[in-house]
Amino acid sequence: MFVDNVDIYVSSGKGGAGAVSFRREKYVIQGGPDGGDGGKGGDLYFEVNANTDTLSKFKGAKHYRAKNGQPGMGRRMSGKSGEEMVIVVPPGTQVFDYESNELLLDLKEEGMRVKFLEGGKGGLGNYHFKNSVNQRPTYAQPGIAGEERHVRLELKLIADVGLVGFPNVGKSTLISTLSNARPEVANYEFTTLIPALGVVDVDEFSSFVMADIPGIIGGASEGKGLGLEFLRHIERTKTLLFVIDLSNYREPLEQFEILQKELSQFSPELSLRPFGIALSKVDALSKEEANEKIELFLKGIGLSSCQSNQYALSEALQNYIAPLESSIPAFVVPISSATHENIKPLKYLLHESVRRRG
């Protein structure tokens, strides 16, 4: 089960109490104080591990506690420190204060380990309280309480390219064609119910990560459909790929305008992200019908086709490739995942877009 939002309580350990103890040795009638200090409470850490990609294990387990420190002992022996608690999360996990919604940690990188809560200090044993007035103190410090917080964990997947489109426009088929991802693919809306990540191999030494999220529909910003709930998973991407269905009953320009509107209402910053456009399911139309729709779409967004063959694009279909200094949109390319038309050029175009943005 994919879970990307949970709230939990986290606590560091309490320090152990100092000991009240006196020397008890043969021939020592009234031994002095020898109570040891309590052990330190365990610290609580967050650690990033790429072997997990969901927060599902936190469902139902509400409280994570480090161990308390052990009490001190006689002969000035300190108590054992409490065992630390390490909470393992996937890359892209953010930790928020549950009440204030303040961002406390942004855990992006594999192997990252952050101390979040400090364990309480152990109390001092009665040995420390001996003085000229009080030779046999019967007081020792209690341990200091650990820290506790109520936090919300939110997962934002880390990908280079984010797919954006209406339901059933071919996003899942595209990511499974380009990458190692295997999302469910079917000819009905909302087949994709959870985000999917796929690694796209460009050549022996180059690759990038692509993220697919459930389709967005008009009114998503008011809570309709599923896509808006998962838009956070493409917030970290370097570039977006709008997937527009040429065979859809909605005209391509209408699809694009609705998607842009919903993105801007979710996040103005995301709506300004560099992007490319893939006009999908071109195999469902004749070349004449497809070119007519492509030309109409390009005109609608203020562009004209350039019939570029720089990336070995199909010569039978119109396209648009932006000059190097331009970034929005970087390209408009008709594709077919069924026949693989322009799929390899699309891979190179996306890789170039990612490479330009570091």
Swiss-Prot record:
Gene Ontology molecular function: any one: magnesium ion binding
Encoding gene per record: obg
Protein name: GTPase Obg
Annotated GTP binding sites: 165-172, 190-194, 212-215, 280-283, 336-338
EC number: 3.6.5.-
UniProt KW keywords: Cytoplasm, GTP-binding, Hydrolase, Magnesium, Metal-binding, Nucleotide-binding
Cofactor(s), names only, from the UniProt record: Mg(2+)
Obg domain sequence ranges: 1-158
Residues that, per the record, bind Mg(2+): S172, T192
Similarity comment text for this entry: Belongs to the TRAFAC class OBG-HflX-like GTPase superfamily. OBG GTPase family.
Protein location: Cytoplasm
Gene Ontology, cellular component aspect: cytoplasm
Role played: An essential GTPase which binds GTP, GDP and possibly (p)ppGpp with moderate affinity, with high nucleotide exchange rates and a fairly low GTP hydrolysis rate. Plays a role in control of the cell cycle, stress response, ribosome biogenesis and in those bacteria that undergo differentiation, in morphogenesis control.
GO BP terms: ribosome biogenesis
UniProt subunit comment: Monomer.
